[in-house]
């Protein structure tokens, strides 16, 4: 029921609203005036903002507002200004080779910065944000190169990819499956020999036999010293860097059913100048030759 007479709460000393429900009275604590005025001010500001700036969505576009402001247009102006500022460097990158770009400190710095951004968008998904790679994806920070670490060699690999079916200049190599060519004993012997090149093998008595099997079946690609062949994309087996896993069982698995990674050809997607920037960036990571 409503109480027409003012009532002051005995505990708090605050006047009640005059309403009572089941013996419970509501204290009359109005909002502070500054809060009320601030609330009114935000309403007025919101109305002014809606009139001045784009705000109300229509069927095809939002209302433009009396000021005609457009954040999209502002970004367009900033992008145009950035492109204009970079135009000189971009032109020089397009005209010069990767080696010439690296030899020019200003161009090299610009290309490394631009290449790092491109790498994060297009390459980090496989090679990692720090270019350290992972199982099946080469580490680009070290000096272990399948196809060569010179600037133009890196450019060639990025531009045309690895085993990219539609690119006639792609890097290509294929390790045959030895599961039907060698006996399990021979593969075990070969794995023991390969592991002995970088660490103590678990079965040292198999090393000499494995060395002979390696010479007969593997040396034609990996070399008599097992240090690989960049022209063929055959990895160095004597440096303790493993692309598809470490250990004798991983070596045997690769011999039986080889894994062949594929890297897309980036030249059609990114264009020559951007591929050059990527090549300069990868070369700068520490393993470039």
From Swiss-Prot:
UniProt similarity note: Belongs to the CcoP / FixP family.
Extent of the signal sequence: none
GO CC list: plasma membrane
Pathway in which this enzyme or protein is active: Energy metabolism; oxidative phosphorylation
Keywords: Cell inner membrane, Cell membrane, Electron transport, Heme, Hydrogen ion transport, Ion transport, Iron, Membrane, Metal-binding, Oxidoreductase, Plasmid, Repeat, Respiratory chain, Transmembrane, Transmembrane helix, Transport
Function description: C-type cytochrome. Part of the cbb3-type cytochrome c oxidase complex. FixP subunit is required for transferring electrons from donor cytochrome c via its heme groups to FixO subunit. From there, electrons are shuttled to the catalytic binuclear center of FixN subunit where oxygen reduction takes place. The complex also functions as a proton pump.
Cytoplasmic compartment spans: 1-33
Domain Cytochrome c: 110-198, 205-286
Gene3D superfamilies on file: 6.10.280.130, Cytochrome c-like domain (1.10.760.10)
Amino-acid positions noted as binding heme c 2 in the UniProt annotation, renumbered to this chain: 175, 218, 221-222
Free-text comment on the cofactor: Binds 2 heme C groups per subunit.
Organism listed in the record: Sinorhizobium medicae (strain WSM419)
Pfam families: Cytochrome_CBB3, FixP_N
Gene label: fixP
Membrane topology annotation: Single-pass membrane protein
NCBIfam families: ccoP
Sequence intervals crossing the membrane: 34-56
Subcellular location as annotated: Cell inner membrane
Subunit structure, as described in the record: Component of the cbb3-type cytochrome c oxidase at least composed of FixN, FixO, FixQ and FixP.
Keyword Iron set for record: yes
UniProt topological domain (Periplasmic) ranges: 57-289
Protein name in UniProt: Cbb3-type cytochrome c oxidase subunit FixP
Binding site for heme c 1: 123, 126-127, 263
Requisite cofactors: heme c
One example GO MF annotation: oxidoreductase activity
One GO BP: proton transmembrane transport
């Amino acid at each position: 029921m409503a109480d027409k007479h003012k009532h002051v709460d005995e505990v708090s000393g605050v006047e009640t609203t005059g309403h009572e429900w089941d013996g419970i009275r509501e204290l009359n604590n109005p909002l502070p005036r500054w809060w009320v005025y601030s609330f009114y001010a935000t309403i007025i500001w919101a109305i002014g903002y809606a009139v001045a700036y784009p705000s109300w969505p229509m069927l095809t576009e939002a209302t433009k507002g009396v000021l005609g402001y457009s954040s999209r247009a502002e970004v367009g102006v900033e992008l145009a200004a950035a492109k204009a500022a970079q135009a000189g460097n971009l032109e020089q990158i397009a005209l010069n080779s990767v080696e010439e770009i690296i030899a020019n400190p200003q161009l090299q710095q610009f290309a490394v910065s631009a290449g790092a951004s491109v790498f994060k968008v297009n390459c980090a998904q496989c090679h990692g944000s720090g270019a350290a790679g992972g199982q099946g994806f080469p580490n680009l920070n070290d000096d272990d190169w399948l196809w060569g670490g010179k600037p133009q060699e890196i450019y060639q690999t990025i531009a045309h990819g690895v085993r990219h079916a539609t690119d006639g200049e792609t890097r290509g190599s294929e390790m045959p499956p030895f599961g039907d060519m060698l006996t399990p004993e021979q593969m075990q012997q070969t794995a023991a020999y390969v592991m002995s090149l970088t660490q103590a093998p678990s079965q040292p008595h198999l090393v000499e036999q494995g060395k002979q099997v390696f010479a007969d079946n593997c040396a034609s690609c990996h070399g008599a010293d097992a240090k690989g062949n960049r022209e063929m994309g055959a990895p160095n087996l004597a440096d303790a860097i493993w692309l598809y896993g470490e250990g004798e069982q991983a070596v045997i698995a690769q011999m039986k059913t080889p894994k062949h990674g594929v890297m897309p050809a980036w030249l059609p997607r990114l264009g020559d100048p951007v591929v050059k920037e990527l090549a300069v960036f990868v070369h700068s990571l520490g393993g470039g030759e």
